[in-house]
Amino acid sequence: KSVIPNKINTILGDIRAFPYELFDELLQLANPKERLIYLLTGACSARASQVLNLTLYDIDYVNQRVWLIDPRSNDQLGLHGVGRKNFLKDAYNINAAKNKPHVNIGFKTPIPLRYKERLPLFWFSSMYKNLFFETLSEVKSIPESNRNPKHPFFFVTKTGNRLTPQQVDIAFKAHCKKLKKMHPEYVVQLNGIGLHSLRHMFGVVMASFEAKIIMSGNKHNIPVDQIKITTQEAMGHRSRASTDIYFNRPWHLNVELGEYLNKVYDTMIENKKWNYLEENNYGKKRFA
């Protein structure tokens, strides 16, 4: 069975994704703080606004779990089971829906899809989760007591002010400019893309993983239908149509032979407990 969709679907669902073949080089170009942001957007599918709302209390260092919680709502429970909106108001007198700069950062919709179950972020490969927690030790965090005004958000400037999506996007585009010089063959793919292209990359990697499994004859008996379900859950898509955009694309030879995808594929296959689908958390036999 062919995994190549018809051309009409491809055109209708066209997206601008960061080329996953260059993801590791992007991480190498970044400083530790930028690397953490790129890992959350690229390997977890988070939006910039979601990443920048990470707080000092949303990281489980022991079990290597991360949560991104909407600061304007009490729907997601944070530290000690307290709604994030109430926590910020009571501890810091912050109203993220009204006060600047918080209101300018926003959040959009939560991820994963069933966030009320307090599910942590999903990583498409454990090697990136490991790199994230290794990189955390390289970031010099400014204590809350040294921040004026006081706040708990993780990503800050040297003066303790919150990083903005605009600042992060400028750094990302500077890195893309360097990558274009290093890899002229990727100029077209790198032109005009922003940080959101890393979220798109996540969807493309997951869809490429499905294609790789099908093309290889699924020797490991991986539940192929679960891959799309997991992608929808991880990216927080309420509609399956939003997820289908990534899967309804033509597959090229690099899906089968590409060095990067083979490396990611191998790490996925090696994890026998199937971390990537998280069947207990992400809905075993759950269909849209």
Question: For each predicted feature, which ranges?
Answer:
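Short, flexible/disordered intra-domain loops and linkers
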Residues: 1, 9-13, 78-82, 211-224
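Flexible interdomain linker/hinge and immediately adjacent N-terminus
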Residues: 1-22, 158
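The alpha-helix within a helix-turn-helix
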Residues: 41, 52, 232
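Short, basic (Lys/Arg/His-rich) helix/loop patches that form interaction surfaces
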Residues: 161-162, 169-233
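Catalytic-site neighborhood detector that most strongly recognizes the C-terminal catalytic loop/helix
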Residues: 222-225, 234-266
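Conserved tyrosine-mediated DNA breakage-rejoining catalytic core shared by Y-recombinases
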Residues: 54-135, 141-144
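Basic, Lys/Arg- and aromatic-enriched nucleic-acid-binding interface segment
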Residues: 20-48, 227
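C-terminal secondary-structure termini that scaffold catalytic or DNA-interacting sites
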Residues: 93, 256-288
